[in-house]
């Protein structure tokens, strides 16, 4: 975001399924829990919910057996904030889903999102006073200058949903407000999609995938 020239040169089109430009309005209880409890600081590894393929192969028979309701509820709770299974047909897709979900991320990425949520602004990673001086030459993490997005001209497709607890629609709309030429941004507003429904839901075949393909072909 701080280097629009680089973005324009290297990105032809941008697609974001479940757009998360910031988490100012994200209601997910896990974000609030991690912020309050500092539990992420206790995790000794660098990955967060990144499971080896072998573990997924163990989950598949377990989560497609009589215990599947428990697995489905846990996954739904993680990605929708409720026990509702959303638009996913777990009976049909469970075997595929549990090989790949949860997909995981780096622990530092999770900490960064919590920092952004707490600061209520888009900023670089906060290493702490001493390390910030080494990385940035200042004691606090630099804030991304969203005014530089004014001339953004990369054709973009962003999906938002009222049921996505990570990608709050208002956060996306606030971000797009920084862009002068809003015609380059296509916003696909959906109903009752949680954060993994964009990819796994049966209805995505009709409501999302064709629009993505058409956007790429334009």
Label every PLM stretch briefly:
Residues 1-136:
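Alpha/beta-hydrolase-fold enzymes
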Residues 15, 157-159, 186-188:
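Hydrophobic/aromatic beta-strand patches that form the interior of the parallel beta-sheet core
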Residues 20-22, 117, 163-164, 192-195:
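Conserved beta-strand elements of beta-rich interaction domains across eukaryotes
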Residues 140-153:
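The feature captures the conserved acid-bearing segment of alpha/beta-hydrolase catalytic domains
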Residues 152-153, 157-160, 164:
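Short beta-strand/loop motif that positions the catalytic acidic residue
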Residues 154, 168-178:
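Short alpha-helix in the alpha/beta-hydrolase fold that links the catalytic acid
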Residues 182-218:
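Catalytic active-site module of serine/aspartate enzymes centered on a nucleophile-bearing elbow/loop
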